[in-house]
Regions:
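Structural motif
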Residues: 125-127, 188-196, 236-241, 281-285, ...
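Bacterial N-terminal signal peptides
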Residues: 19-30
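Residue-level detector of Asp-centered blade-edge/turn motifs that repeat once per structural unit
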Residues: 173-175, 222-223, 267-268, 311-312, ...
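Multi-bladed beta-propeller domains
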Residues: 199-214, 243-261, 287-305, 331-347, ...
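Hydrophobic beta-strand positions that form the internal "hydrophobic ladder"
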Residues: 179, 227-228, 269-272, 313-317, ...
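Amphipathic beta-strand/beta-sheet edge segments enriched in Tyr/Trp
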Residues: 39, 97-163
Length: 448
């Protein structure tokens, strides 16, 4: 977002000045509040219940206030970890400048309450404020204010969602991010495939390519505003290309006479790792984007493809049929010590390394079905997140808590996007204008 400075802390209203004083001391002195006064939701391997929470309509400007609070409500509901209270059950419309009537709110069963206000300064800039209240303890848990342009009101809702989500769950933010994907339209035998980008909730969709060439396997850079993808024009070899989302500049990489595919950026965004066809086999190759210097990571008779960097850049996971079937392997970033990490029934392909570094997601095909699975980088602890027909293309959210993928039921239809959390207990559809495949999740936009 342009003209969106870092959020500043927002003090509690005067009606709660004693609580505010304690909160300030807790921050300044590292004082730990009693456990029962903490608004927390711990997400783990066991069962959990979504937290009941109320998100009040933001006061001030009625149209923009409703827009921002609506974004927050939708985000928290879609996360699977919160159940927003229906406004018809609200006991009051909270006054942003006063403490809520906690006794009334406790009677509704909610544990958290979000209040806010949208106003304009003399120059016409927006000021968006919010507070998160712990209804049980009557404490303000956090509060911030943002200054921005009117056009950025919706994105401010994503930033507020992240602040609430991280405060309560202890997990990293992810709402202030985007998704790129391949938009598919037209008859199945002659699909037009365009690169599109949208907010993670499906809003603000825009086409990046025209559809004159077929687009496959886009991937965001972790460090720049670039997306790498495979592009194929009729009668030509598929080529890896990189496009900058800010300038629209586009460049082709790889050898003209060789098919290059499955590009992935290094964590610093300076290199690409890809699969390059060499005769009847395909090898993993890294390329310096600036100098175009190449280094072979694998060199053999197998089909090695779909490489993905560990977030620290020290290792690469990839897919290979060197053992007789498609499986996931891990090697050093310099190509050293390649070793298989997936075993058991069926094949495993399309690995994606979590930005937290703790998990690798992949597609496992077995018994006629396609499962999205995760395991530790050494292959232990495999678990199935979701299973069905043609679940493919896993990619992690910026906080590593959700996996985005596409599901194609077959026939004359096409794929649709879904996300599932790493516990496998939350699965949500992601709206797209048409059929969609090959999603990739951006890093957080804040500070970019």
């Amino acid at each position: 977002m342009q003209n969106l400075p870092s959020a500043g802390p927002l003090p509690a209203p005067l009606a709660a000045r004693l609580v505010a004083l304690l909160a300030v001391l807790a921050v300044a002195l590292g004082f730990a509040a009693p456990a029962q006064a903490q608004l927390q939701l711990r997400i783990g391997g066991g069962s959990f219940q979504p937290m009941p929470i109320a998100i009040a309509d933001f006061g001030g400007d009625p149209s923009l206030g409703g827009l921002v609070s609506g974004v927050v409500t939708n985000n928290l509901r879609r996360s699977g970890y919160f159940t927003p209270l229906d406004h018809a059950r609200f006991p009051e419309q909270p006054n942003f400048d006063a403490a809520p009537n906690f006794e009334k709110w406790r009677a509704t069963g909610v544990q958290g309450l979000v209040t806010g206000r949208v106003s304009r300064d003399p120059s016409g800039k927006l000021k968006v404020e919010f507070r998160l209240w712990d209804v049980t303890s009557g404490q303000q848990m956090t509060g911030q204010q943002y200054g921005t342009d009117t056009a950025n009101a919706r994105r401010t809702g994503h930033l507020i969602s992240d602040a609430v989500y991280t405060k309560i769950t202890g997990l990293g933010p992810w709402f202030d991010s985007r998704i790129a994907f391949v938009d598919e339209s037209g008859p199945k035998e002659n699909r037009r495939k365009r690169l599109m980008v949208m907010d993670q909730d499906g809003a603000n969709v825009r086409a990046i390519t025209s559809g004159e060439t077929s687009i496959v396997a886009p991937r965001y850079s972790p460090a720049t505003q670039d997306i790498a993808f495979m592009s194929q024009a009729t009668g030509h070899q598929p080529r890896v290309q990189v496009i900058n989302l800010e300038t629209g500049a586009r460049q082709a990489l790889g050898n003209v006479d060789s098919m290059s595919a499955s590009p992935r950026f290094s964590p610093d965004g300076r290199r690409l790792v890809m699969s390059v066809q060499q005769g009847g086999n395909a090898d993993i190759v890294t390329m310096d984007i600036a100098t175009k210097a190449q280094h072979s990571g694998t060199n053999g008779m197998a089909i090695d493809t779909s490489p993905t960097y560990a977030p620290d850049g020290s290792q690469i996971a990839f897919e290979s049929d060197r053992g007789g079937s498609q499986q996931v392997y891990v090697m050093g970033a310099d190509g050293s010590n390649p070793h298989r990490i997936t075993f058991g029934a069926g094949s495993a392909s399309q690995p994606a390394w979590s930005p937290r570094g703790d998990l690798i997601a992949y597609t496992r095909q077995r018994n006629g079905g396609f499962a999205i699975c995760v395991s530790k980088p050494d292959g232990t602890g495999e678990r199935v997140l979701t299973e069905g027909y043609h679940n493919e293309g896993p990619t992690f959210a910026p906080n590593g808590q959700y996996v985005l993928f596409f599901r194609d039921p077959g026939g004359q239809g096409g794929g649709k996007l879904f996300m599932v959390d790493i516990t496998g207990k939350v699965e949500q559809p992601i709206p797209t204008p048409s059929y969609a495949s090959d999603p990739t999740w951006s890093p957080l936009l804040a500070g970019r």
